[in-house]
Amino acid sequence: MSLCDVHCHTERSACAEDVTLEWYVDIARNTDAVFTITDHSAQLYYPPDNRWAFWGDNPREVFDSCRDEGPARIASYIEDVRAVQTGGMLLGIELDIFIDGTVVCDEDRLGDFDLFLGVAHTFPALRAEADVEEVYDQFQTMVGHLAKLNIDALAHPFRPMRGKGYEISDDLIKWLVDIAGEYDFALEINSHSICRDEDIRMAKLAWEMGVELAVGTDSHRKAEFGDFSYHRE
């Protein structure tokens, strides 16, 4: 069974290592692989010399300072990928938002993507390492905003919280599967940074409730691309 990878990075993401758009184009031309280019919207929107600003101390100030240049950079990204798009390569984006729902992208261009992932990479309670109840509450707020944007899938739902040491409750997983079903978006099983227990619980419940799962390698390195061993397991 062939799988569609919904989550692949290029050099336009600051976290990428050896993957490039040119490399993916070569794969698309010479294989039957189906995959989606999904670079971080914040790292496309923010200045090239400050691509980690969204995760920094003053993300809103930097965002406000590039409201003209940011949309232009998003437009350039779309044009660059579309110009070389071929075979089974799709154009997507990994969409960052603020806790108030502000999209870190040109919202008018969201319809220009073949697929877009929503993501709750960071939010105030998580950065402050607040009590778990506050973290859960803000995570639910973030996902609620993303759901209303008609995302196709939610990327690595639990990685940011697990990375800070928070346990993920069955109730939170149930809430997430419920809202995914209500708003008809998929939940990603992500193999770049594995949350095995949470993925198993989420996948079992999604299967029972008829909620779609998405397959993402979240490729930052060439060695990760096309490796679906975790998903098949």
PLM regions and their residue ranges:
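Charged catalytic cores and adjacent phosphate/nucleic-acid-binding surfaces used
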Residues: M1-V6, T10, E17, L21-E22, ...
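Active-site metal-binding loops of divalent metal-dependent hydrolases
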Residues: C8, D39-S41, L95, A120-H121, ...
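Generic macromolecular interface patches on structured domains
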Residues: A16, T38, M89-L90
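Catalytic domains of carbohydrate-active enzymes, especially glycoside hydrolases
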Residues: W23-S41
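Short coil/turn segments at beta-strand junctions that form active-site/ligand-binding loops
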Residues: A33, G87, V211
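Hydrophobic residues within beta-strands of alpha/beta enzymes
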Residues: F35-I37, F116, L154, L187, ...
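Extended substrate/RNA-proximal surfaces in nucleic-acid metabolism proteins
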Residues: L44-E182
